[in-house]
Amino acid sequence: SDVCSPDLVSRGHIDGCILAHDANLGFAETMAAKGARVRIPTTINAISVDRRNWRQQGVDHAFGSRASRLADSYVDMGAVPSFTCAPYLLGDPPAAGECIGWSESNAVIYANSVLGARTLKIPDYLDLFVAMTGRAPYCGTYADSGRQAQRIIELAGIPEDVDDGFWPLLGWVAGKHAPDRIPLLRGLENLQAGTDAMKAVCAAFGSTSGAPMLHIAGHTPEAGMPSAPAADRVTIDREMLADAWRQLNSGGADIDLVAIGSPHLSDRKSTRLNSSHQIIS
């Protein structure tokens, strides 16, 4: 049965802290100047600069100062200076059935799909009002009916010995096949998938789909709930995944920069990276 109500939003996550345009800064500073305060525990997404070190890093002052002011505004309003796009990796992740008010696509998809928490994909600016009031519109994935799979995706011919690269590829392709609806993925029940694998699926899925969650049979807690009566079916086979892999690896051979951490790496991933590669700072 439905477990959420608009009065039970327990925590928030702010995504409007990125300096995407001047409106983000103007909105935050105006609200802070008016005395706005969050009333529920609220984390802050990754921001546009290293708040402590952007000057030493040579960031343009006009940009760095504005980006830092934007972050400061949300801290001044009582948000926790977490500065991560993976708040579910912090020490107190949401529980199954907990109603939260999060923004940022991978965080929302992971919370709904893997943790079984409930949140809309809260847009910028509204994320602050949710944090200020502890209330959110009761619709969509807050309700049982808004969490049903509307497309069943059968995975065919997938070997059991997949490596780490499989999971983001799967999420990217699944999103392509369910760009506007919640899917249920079947056929992966025998695969081993930990936190990092699920994080990779959710983040990549959010880059190609607007849906706020997905179900994976054998891996996510609500995969057994009844699908929507009108749910249709599609198949993703091994060759389709191979085609996508080739598409994603079609760039030039010369590489100037490798950027990692979108979303932020877990401690496990950071340790593995540090132990197997020479880190150049």
Task: Annotate each predicted stretch with a short phrase.
Residues 9, 38-42, 81-85, 118, ...:
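General beta-strand structural signal in soluble alpha/beta enzymes
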Residues 228-272, 281:
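Glycine-rich phosphate/ribose-binding loops and adjacent secondary-structure elements
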Residues 202-238, 248-250:
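Active-site cores of enzymes that catalyze phosphoryl transfer or operate on phosphate-rich substrates
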Residues 93, 125, 131-163, 167-169:
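Intrinsically disordered, low-complexity linker/loop segments enriched in Gly/Pro
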Residues 1, 6-34, 119-123, 130-135:
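N-terminal basic/disordered segments at the start of proteins
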Residues 44-134:
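A generic, well-ordered mixed alpha/beta core segment in the N-terminal half of proteins
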Residues 2-5, 273-277:
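Short, small-residue-biased leader/transition segments that mark boundaries at the very start
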Residues 162-219:
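Extended, H/D-rich, highly charged conserved domains that either
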